[in-house]
Amino acid sequence: MYQVLLFIYVVVAIALIGFILVQQGKGANAGASFGGGASGTMFGSAGAGNFLTRTSAILATAFFVIALVLGNMNSHKGNVQKGTFDDLSQAAEQVQQQAAPAKDNKNSDIPQ
């Protein structure tokens, strides 16, 4: 269930990005290169803006709802397994107990 919602979440995010990029801007008319500014488009002169605005609003709502559901599902996972890094104090104690004292090496080249 989590993987299906995650897949839908990614698809909605990509679709939302696409619909926002295709919309006609106020100044630059970036959407006109994709047919958003022409009057003879598939949706008519005013229909494309209305369709793109509604679809973007629906996709944005779905994006936030799915994000909340995924966050809720992720926070309520009951079977949390103990990981390797959960209890590092035991490993530190073992390392301290196994440490050997340093030998005095009189023939060493390192000054003391």
From Swiss-Prot:
Pfam families: SecG. GO terms for cellular component: plasma membrane. The chain crosses the membrane at residues 2-22, 51-71. Signal peptide: none annotated. Residues 103-112 have a biased composition (Basic and acidic residues). Residues 92-112 are annotated as: Disordered. It is found in: Cell inner membrane. One of its GO terms (molecular function) is protein-transporting ATPase activity. The keyword Metal-binding does not apply. It is a multi-pass membrane protein. InterPro entries: SecG (IPR004692). Residues 92-102 have a biased composition (Low complexity). Keywords: Cell inner membrane, Cell membrane, Membrane, Protein transport, Translocation, Transmembrane, Transmembrane helix, Transport. GO terms for biological process: intracellular protein transmembrane transport; protein secretion; protein transport by the Sec complex. Belongs to the SecG family. Involved in protein export. Participates in an early event of protein translocation. NCBIfam families: secG. This is Protein-export membrane protein SecG.
